[in-house]
Amino acid sequence: MDAQGDAGAQGGSQGPRPSNKRLQQTQAQVDEVVGIMKVNVEKVLERDQKLSQLDDRADALQEGASQFEKSAATLKRKYWWKNIKMMIIMCAIVVILIIIIVLWAGGK
């Protein structure tokens, strides 16, 4: 047999052998899966970074809320005492007015 006959018998002129074609298809599928997995890993890393930033912002908001709560409680106490002082002053003025009226009415 000549070289062409051997090549024709082996299927060299007909293209790749079926096992090579299957191997190429499998390799293409593996490459596709690897590409998809790389994209997924990148997305997971981005998500982790965003979650970390969100956690930091939540901590800052919690700290701000705690400070606001303390300030509000302090302010509430301050105005409660101012209100009590005003009530005491009003009562003292009313008592003084009653005493003045009683003394003025009793002096006649």
UniProtKB/Swiss-Prot annotation:
It is found in: Cytoplasmic vesicle, Secretory vesicle, Synaptic vesicle membrane; Cell membrane; Synapse, Synaptosome. Residues 1-85 are cytoplasmic. The chain crosses the membrane at residues 86-106. Its main location: membrane. It comes from the Eukaryota. GO terms for biological process: defecation; nematode larval development; regulation of hindgut contraction; regulation of nematode pharyngeal pumping; synaptic transmission, cholinergic; synaptic vesicle exocytosis; vesicle fusion. Residues 1-25 are annotated as: Disordered. Residues 22-82 form the v-SNARE coiled-coil homology domain. One of its GO terms (cellular component) is cortical granule. InterPro entries: Synaptobrevin-like, Synaptobrevin/VAMP, V_SNARE_CC. Signal peptide: none annotated. Involved in the targeting and/or fusion of transport vesicles to their target membrane. Acts in neuronal exocytosis of synaptic transmission. Likely to have a role in cholinergic transmisson. Required for viability, coordinated movement and M3 pharynx motor neuron function. Part of the SNARE core complex containing CBG09569/SNAP25, snb-1/VAMP2 and CBG03570/STX1A. This complex binds to cpx-1/CPLX1. Belongs to the synaptobrevin family. This is Synaptobrevin-1. It comes from Caenorhabditis briggsae.
